[in-house]
Amino acid sequence: MSTSAVLFLLLAVFAAGASAATFNIKNNCGSTIWPAGIPVGGGFELGSGQTSSINVPAGTQAGRIWARTGCSFNGGSGSCQTGDCGGQLSCSLSGQPPATLAEFTIGGGSTQDFYDISVIDGFNLAMDFSCSTGDALQCRDPSCPPPQAYQHPNDVATHACSGNNNYQITFCP
């Protein structure tokens, strides 16, 4: 077998190990929230009791999803009381504190994903975050304990999930 054929097969095997993930986002809060995500997910309105999904491609590094509150938008511009991202409905920047963060890397360990909840940027809403085959993380108040959430940059609250899984984020569980 030629060197180029072997290289092609190896690349195909590694690429097959990681795939996109679907993030189901549920709003259990008593009012509308505006979930946002970078580098994918942008932003959207999510009424109380509603669920929406975003697809995150394999290879996404340092992704974040958070809920903005107290927002008012006219077209694609406006402002939010918490988690605002430059006054835009569709975020391309991280939200302003305070914002409870769901953080993730999809396919970062070849066949593993990594995820955590972070309150380093402050706390604005309670959150549950889980993958279909991993630990269920819960952060219900600003002092949620490690290993449930990052509170300081040196915490070790990252969890692993086998690749090819989907995720559930619930705000106000």
UniProtKB/Swiss-Prot annotation:
Taxonomic superkingdom: Eukaryota
GO biological process: defense response
Signal peptide boundaries: 1-20
Keyword Signal on entry: yes
SUPFAM superfamilies: Osmotin, thaumatin-like protein
PROSITE patterns reported in the protein's UniProt record: THAUMATIN_1, THAUMATIN_2
Keywords for this protein: Pathogenesis-related protein, Plant defense, Signal
Tagged with keyword Amino-acid biosynthesis: no
Pfam families: Thaumatin (PF00314)
Similarity comment: Belongs to the thaumatin family.
Protein name: Pathogenesis-related protein 1A/1B
